[in-house]
Amino acid sequence: KDFTEQYVLGNLYEILLDESGFDADYRPAGGSSENHQAIVNGEIDLYPEYTGTALLTHLGLEFDSTMDADVVYATVKDAYAQDFNLAVLEPTDFNNTYVLVMTKAKASELGIETVSDISTKGGDLVFGTTQEFTERDDGLPGLRETYGGFNFKEVVRSAHAQRLRLLNSM
């Protein structure tokens, strides 16, 4: 996947596989959809995937609020075996969760303390994100469906590494 933490994970997997006697070659292959298609097509052998991404994006399944991490993992593991003939390995301790970040000054100025506040006061905000987040069910569309609103003055799409610079420039 094409962002910093994935570059780190990819290189870590390459090192661990090499040290375990495998001849591993890490090659970034794009975003979630590109990596998924590449593994289904046999173009790559392994890549780190998030169970939430697998559930919502690749399998097109709905998240149910009663599903904990173990249920999501089991659902993804079973469906990947059945639908794609792919083995989902045991989860690592690595975790990635989306959060919304804004400066304290801007939050104070607009009276924003919760995600619900952002949903109703977004008209004054410029939202920096990736193209993928604007399209994913667990991204901006999911926020809009869950909270309503989330209509920003502007949505600026940028690479992951550029968002901190964007936030600091405001």
Task: State where each predicted segment sits.
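Short, polar/charged alpha-helical segment
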Residues: T4-D23, I39, P141-E145
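Short helix-initiation/N-cap motifs at beta->coil->alpha
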Residues: F3-T4, D25-Q37, K153-R165
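Sec/Tat-exported extracytoplasmic proteins
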Residues: D2, L16-G21, G42-E43, P48-A54, ...
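Extracytoplasmic "Venus flytrap"
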Residues: K1-N11, G30-S32, E132-E135
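Pocket-flanking alpha-helical
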Residues: S32-F63, A74-K77, Q162-L167
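Second-shell loop/turn segments in exported
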Residues: K1-F3, D23-Y26, E62-D64, A87, ...
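Ligand-binding pocket segment of bilobal, Venus flytrap-like solute-binding proteins
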Residues: I44-D45, G123-M170
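A conserved helix-loop-strand patch within extracytoplasmic ligand-binding domains
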Residues: A69-V126
